[in-house]
């Protein structure tokens, strides 16, 4: 959520900026009307509260002197209903204003390129050289079919479309990838491993920005009166660990990593990537989350992105680093780097990691703060998140980049200790 003072003091300028950089239309007239009404009701409420307080004080003084207070009590009773109604009206209009604020996306940093969509993203760097094959290559679906490793038919029987059953060596490779990533981030990058719930409440999703705007993207479950949601990323669970917390300065930065199942409805995918495992309803991801002081978030963003890059480099997978434009960034992000891995069957790079600095946007929604050691006062933290990386897509990239003419897969050297020394599967 943006700083409310922007809505109150710089509304026209904010609306123009949001339209230009985010393509988001803010109804200025409606918001001005709401704010004007809020001020009117608030002034009226405060006047009545002040009157109540003065009358209550007078009643107390009169009673202490043994005087009759019935007239004063009657005066209080005369406006108490008005005060109660005014307080309710004030709360209602504050809720309306908050609903508007919760739907407004974060503002990009000044160095984020202006653009409408992914075509305006800017490539920052490349690593590795795509392999040249001397045989007809297969995509991951064909490679999986050769050995019965990827079973979409059984998954469809169990759950429907966009699910896959992994069998045998490929299931083992998938597990090895996740374990290897976790070990790297914990042992070499200094992240704390955290095992988090994959079912969360609505407050958690409000905190990180999935609700109320993106509810259609979420799977949910209802038990009695309690509605819960399956996480689309463990960023949700990890980041909300600091919700309503005040963190001492010497504990920052907090760096956490989790390997979890993730669930997405893919409501807006428009039929894209229906073949294979590129876009699934259920998938696994190793997620990185950092919580830091505001002055440290830019450096932390570069560090986190570099940690994700290291995963691809240790696997020997060619990739490129992309700076997202204003129109392609996520709702809560103020700056995002995507990492795209090379897929030989498609002859192109595909997203495998997205690393975002959210500034104080999520922290304000969560009331996540740190205690400034100089002033002694609580201030909003900055939050960052990044895939370190998507496990299923990493498996696809390994299958395709390490395939052999006979349909077997060479196991990357770094994964062999996790697979009892196997150098090849299939």
UniProtKB/Swiss-Prot annotation:
The record lists L-serine as bound by: 233-235, 287, 387
**Which top-level group of life is the source organism from?**
Bacteria
PROSITE patterns per UniProt: AA_TRNA_LIGASE_II
The portions of this protein that span the membrane are none
Q: In which pathway does it act?
A: Aminoacyl-tRNA biosynthesis; selenocysteinyl-tRNA(Sec) biosynthesis; L-seryl-tRNA(Sec) from L-serine and tRNA(Sec): step 1/1
Report which residue ranges the record marks as coiled coil: none
Give, as one word, the top-level EC class: ligase
Single GO biological process annotation from the record: selenocysteine biosynthetic process
Write the Enzyme Commission number(s) for this entry.
6.1.1.11
Q: Which GO terms describe its cellular component?
A: cytoplasm
UniProt: ATP binding residues: 264-266, 351-354
The listed locations are: Cytoplasm
For this UniProt entry, the molecular function terms from Gene Ontology, in alphabetical order, are:
ATP binding; serine-tRNA ligase activity
State the CDD domains in the record. Answer: SerRS_core (cd00770)
Q: Which reaction does it catalyse?
A: tRNA(Ser) + L-serine + ATP = L-seryl-tRNA(Ser) + AMP + diphosphate + H(+); tRNA(Sec) + L-serine + ATP = L-seryl-tRNA(Sec) + AMP + diphosphate + H(+)
Entry similarity comment: Belongs to the class-II aminoacyl-tRNA synthetase family. Type-1 seryl-tRNA synthetase subfamily.
Note the HAMAP family from the entry: Ser_tRNA_synth_type1
Function, please? Catalyzes the attachment of serine to tRNA(Ser). Is also able to aminoacylate tRNA(Sec) with serine, to form the misacylated tRNA L-seryl-tRNA(Sec), which will be further converted into selenocysteinyl-tRNA(Sec).
Complex formation:
Homodimer. The tRNA molecule binds across the dimer.
Free-text comment on this protein's domains from its UniProt entry: Consists of two distinct domains, a catalytic core and a N-terminal extension that is involved in tRNA binding.
Q: What's the protein here called?
A: Serine--tRNA ligase
Q: What is the protein's species of origin?
A: Xylella fastidiosa (strain Temecula1 / ATCC 700964)
């Amino acid at each position: 959520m943006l700083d409310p003072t922007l809505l109150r003091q710089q509304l026209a300028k904010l609306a123009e900026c949001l339209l230009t950089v985010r393509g988001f239309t803010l109804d200025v007239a409606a918001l001005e009307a709401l704010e004007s009404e809020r001020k009117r009701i608030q002034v009226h409420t405060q006047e009545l509260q002040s009157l109540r307080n003065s009358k209550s004080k007078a009643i107390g003084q009169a009673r202490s002197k043994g005087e009759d207070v019935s007239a004063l009590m009657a005066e209080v009773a005369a406006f108490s209903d008005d005060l109660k109604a005014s307080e309710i009206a004030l709360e209602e209009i504050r809720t309306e204003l908050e609903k508007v604020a919760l739907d407004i996306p974060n503002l990009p940093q000044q160095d984020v390129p202006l653009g409408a969509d992914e075509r305006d993203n800017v490539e920052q760097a490349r690593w590795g050289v795509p392999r040249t094959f001397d045989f007809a290559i297969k995509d991951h679906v064909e490679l999986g079919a050769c050995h019965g490793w990827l079973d979409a038919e059984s998954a469809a029987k169990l759950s429907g479309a966009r699910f896959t059953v992994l069998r045998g060596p490929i299931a083992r490779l998938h597990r090895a990838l996740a374990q290897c990533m976790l070990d790297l981030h914990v042992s070499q990058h200094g992240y704390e491993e955290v095992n988090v719930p994959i079912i969360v409440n609505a407050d958690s999703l409000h905190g990180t920005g999935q609700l109320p705007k993106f509810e259609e993207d979420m799977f949910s479950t209802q038990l009695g009166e309690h509605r819960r949601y399956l996480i689309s990323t463990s960023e949700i669970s990890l980041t909300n660990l600091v919700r309503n917390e005040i963190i001492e300065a010497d504990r920052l930065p907090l760096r956490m990593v989790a390997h979890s199942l993730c669930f997405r409805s893919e409501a807006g995918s428009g039929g894209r990537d229906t073949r294979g495992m590129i876009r699934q309803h259920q998938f696994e991801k190793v997620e990185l989350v950092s919580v830091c002081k505001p002055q440290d978030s830019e450096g932390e963003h570069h560090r986190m992105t570099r940690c994700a890059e290291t995963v691809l480099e240790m696997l020997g997978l060619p990739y490129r680093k992309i700076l997202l434009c204003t129109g392609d960034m996520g709702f809560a992000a103020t700056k995002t780097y995507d990492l795209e891995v090379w897929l030989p069957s498609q002859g192109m790079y595909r997203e495998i990691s997205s690393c975002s600095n959210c500034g104080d946007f999520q922290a304000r929604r969560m009331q996540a703060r740190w205690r400034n050691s100089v002033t002694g006062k609580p201030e909003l933290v900055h939050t960052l998140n990044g895939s370190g990386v998507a496990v299923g897509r990493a498996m696809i990239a390994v299958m395709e980049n390490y395939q052999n003419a006979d349909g077997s897969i060479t196991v990357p050297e770094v994964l062999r200790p996790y697979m009892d020394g196997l150098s090849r599967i299939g």
